[in-house]
Amino acid sequence: DINGGGATLPQKLYQTSGVLTAGFAPYIGVGSGNGKAAFLTNDYTKLTATELSTYATNLQPTWGKLIQVPSVATSVAIPFRITDWSGISGAGRTGPITVVYRITYMSPDFAASTLAGLDDATKGVSPAPSNVSDAIAQVLPPNDPSAPLDVTNPDDGVAGVQPYPDSGYPILGFTNLIFSAFFTKAFFTKHFGDTNNNDDAITANRFVPLPDNWKTELSTYATNLQPTWGK
C-alpha cells in the first residue's frame, strides 16, 4: 500500500470512499507538520532546504521527484471582531456581547457553511463556494504556459501571494498534495480528470474543486516530472 497522511483539514475528504485510488492505505490525519515529516522520511511520525536536499539524495532515485500541487480550495475563516450586538444587522438589540464559549480552531471547510450568509467587510461578498471559485478564476493556474513551473522546485507548484481579486471572496487558500512522482498516475488521473473525478466528494466535504484549466495544467506538470509513471 501507499501510505499517506498529513493535515487534518482534508482528512474527511481523503477518507471518503472512492476518493483515493486502489493501492492507497487509509489517510491518516496527524497535522500538517507531522505529515511533512512522515512523508519525507518514510516515517509515520517537515519542507525546508535541508529536508528537500535529504529527500533528493536518499529517496528521489527510488521514488522519483517530489510533486507539490494544490488539491482543493477553501475559504479562510477569520473570527469576527464584534463586541456589541449593535454591530450585527438585524440583532434587534444593543449592548456588549458576552462570550460564553470560544472555539480555538475551526476548520474553514466547516466554518464556510455557517458563514455563507455573511459578507466580508470590504467587498460585501460571502465565503460561499461559488464566490471562492470566482476569485480563483482570476489567478493563473500553476504551470500556465505564460509562467511554466520549475520542475526542480516542489514549492513552485503552489500559488503564492496574489493580487486582490476584482470579484469573488478574496480570503481563500488551498490544501496541497505532496507526492513522489512514481506513485501518482492513477490518483492524478482521477482527481484532476475531466470526468469521473472527485469533484462531487470535494463539494460534499465543503471544499471547492479547482477550475478545469488548473486541473489541466497540474496534470501536465506532474506528467512532465516523470517520463515513466509509476503506480
From Swiss-Prot:
EC numbers: 2.4.2.30
Temperature characteristics of this protein: Optimum temperature is 80 degrees Celsius. Activity decreases at 90-100 degrees Celsius.
Gene3D superfamilies, alphabetized: Periplasmic binding protein-like II (3.40.190.10)
pH-activity profile: Optimum pH is 6.5-10.
Domain of life: Archaea
Notes on how activity is controlled: Activity increases up to 5-6 times with Mg(2+) at 50 uM or higher ion concentration. 3-aminobenzamide (3-ABA) inhibits the activity by up to half and nicotinamide to a lesser extent. Zn(2+) inhibits the activity to half-maximal rate but at 500 uM concentration of the ion.
Keywords carried by this UniProt record: DNA-binding, Glycosyltransferase, NAD, Nucleotidyltransferase, Transferase
GO function term, MF aspect, one: NAD+ poly-ADP-ribosyltransferase activity
Catalytic activity: NAD(+) + (ADP-D-ribosyl)n-acceptor = nicotinamide + (ADP-D-ribosyl)n+1-acceptor + H(+)
Entry function: Catalyzes auto- and hetero-ADP ribosylation and produces short oligomers by elongating the ADP-ribose chain (up to 6-mer). Binds DNA non-specifically but with high affinity. Forms very stable complexes with circular DNA wherein the circular DNA confers thermostability compared to linear DNA.
Official protein name in the record: NAD(+) ADP-ribosyltransferase
Organism whose genome encodes this protein: Saccharolobus solfataricus (Sulfolobus solfataricus)
